[in-house]
């Protein structure tokens, strides 16, 4: 006797609901051990050229609408996966600077695994791993203790911290200059001499 694959499928380990990080998120529907395969990140397989075109199009749209929802995931050197296409609940997993999940590519497919033990109700997150060259376009709202303020790969954090330190020093110098200007006594206008 064979059971249908539908009856044999495991219950979902996640649920989609409102997130404090960014609109919609994915949350653990059960306690999970480290290295648990949670969900597959699915979508349309596209070339790097098409990926770049869509990315630019989405960034232009974001400037107009404020919605910067980009679900393009690097698959390999030739292809990306556009998770905005089709049924893909994994696209709602938000970024965190202290993620509890990570993505792995297995035989051309992307799976999200738990990095550590996760409690039922915890929001599932992973580090999006963006390049440093676009850091200003991607502020981070994760709220974790070690948040660096922008969505970049952890390997870029030391350089990003140096950049932010320089920006802060430049801004502080500018503010001190403005404060000094404001503190200067205003010269009183000289009275006109009587003739």
Residue ranges and their predicted role:
Residues 3-103, 189:
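Catalytic cores of histone-lysine modification enzymes
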Residues 96-195:
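C-terminal SET catalytic tail plus cysteine-rich post-SET Zn-binding segment of SAM-dependent SET-domain
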